[in-house]
Design a protein with these regions (language model features):
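Non-heme Fe(II)-dependent double-stranded beta-helix
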Residues: 2-41, 46-146
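Short, conserved beta-strand element in jelly-roll/cupin
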Residues: 144-160
Length: 160
């Protein structure tokens, strides 16, 4: 038990619990607000999170270093979505993005400080592709709902 200033005791906090990011601001981004939005609606949109100085080297690496393949499996039959898996094994261009302190703080606010990158994938969705409905990517794990968050996805749109 932890001792509170008033003398009351509270239950110990799990080291795996999400980090309270209330009032935390990094580089002008209110981390607590973003995390609260994720907890409230399941996602948050952060406009202009990444600037051109980060995007351009990644785009260049995707055009020169990373083999991209057509994705006719995994739900797409049009041939209008191309995909590259295991980006961390293929390029160092995304390191800066994945180590961004704002991103790490958001993830810690959602799933806790003990997290790891499991998958880094590129999607190139071309004109004519069917829209994909919002969905949760935790279906691979047969855990009954509701359950604590154990997955936090990031999607960065390079183009409008």
């Amino acid at each position: 038990m932890q001792q509170q200033p008033s003398g009351q005791q509270s239950a110990p906090t799990s080291p795996y619990a999400p980090v309270d990011q209330s009032g935390v601001t990094l580089d002008g981004l209110d981390i607590g607000e973003v995390v609260a939005e994720i907890h409230s609606q399941g996602y948050a949109v952060v406009e202009e999170f990444v600037g051109a100085e980060v995007i351009e080297p990644i785009r260049e690496a995707f055009n020169t270093e990373v083999p991209i393949t057509e994705m006719r499996f995994l739900g797409s039959t049009t041939g209008n979505t191309w995909r590259a898996h295991n980006l961390l094994a293929k390029t160092r261009a995304i390191d800066e993005l994945l180590l961004d302190p704002r991103l790490r703080a958001i993830v810690e606010g959602v799933i806790g400080k003990y997290h790891q990158i499991n998958i880094a994938t590129l999607f190139n969705t071309l004109p004519g592709e069917f829209k994909q409905d919002l969905h949760q990517d935790d279906g691979l794990w047969p855990i009954p709902r509701p359950h604590p968050s154990f997955l936090c996805n990031l999607l960065i749109a390079f183009d409008d």
